[in-house]
Amino acid sequence: MTTPHTVRIWDLPTRIFHWTLALSVIALVITAKVGGNAMEWHFRLGHLVLALLVFRIVWGLIGGRWSRFAAFVYAPARLVRYLRGTPHPDDSVGHSPLGALSVFALLAVLVAQVGTGLLSDDEIAFAGPLTRFVSNAVVGQATGYHKEIGQYLVLGLVALHVLAVLFYVLVRKQRLVRPMLHGDKALAGPVDASRDDMLTRTVALVVLALSLGLAWWVSSLAAAAF
């Protein structure tokens, strides 16, 4: 019987990002549906998600081994092999080829949703901080996408992501949730671990601080208009 190798796959910054983003998206949906004064929190959460997305893009370039985009950018042939049931051994380590598509799609849709949110105006009490830099036509288009298209794309991809996780956990008996909590995976063979030491976490804090600073600066542009 082969002894499983316990390997650190998801570094702490990636795990914190994942769960913070998940909770933030849930809160954004709730505040959007409630409306009224809850929209103040909707805007704050939107800026938090902006910071998280900036952080993840940077971390996808310099983060842990399996958190980097290079670790889950797959060639089409690799995806076809995975769908045919003949996956590469590394496909079960970090994000699988299908999981990678889900990650990139969700990041892209969230970037579009946050971007259009910054340009949106509800014509009542709340307007994004970048509305003063563009024409009314652009504001109208951004608002329309944000309310009528983007939110449903986000909800659809989140639902698809949850269903996929449930399928892999319940049907394929793969533990996907626990590694995103404690970072480690039990694998059949040795693989390179993600670096997750104090230096890595310190760098992540610096990146996060800069990302939060950028989001705060963007939010301050609204106040500068008055």
What are these regions (language model features)?
Residues 1-226:
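Membrane-embedded alpha-helical bundles that constitute the cytochrome b-like, heme-associated redox core
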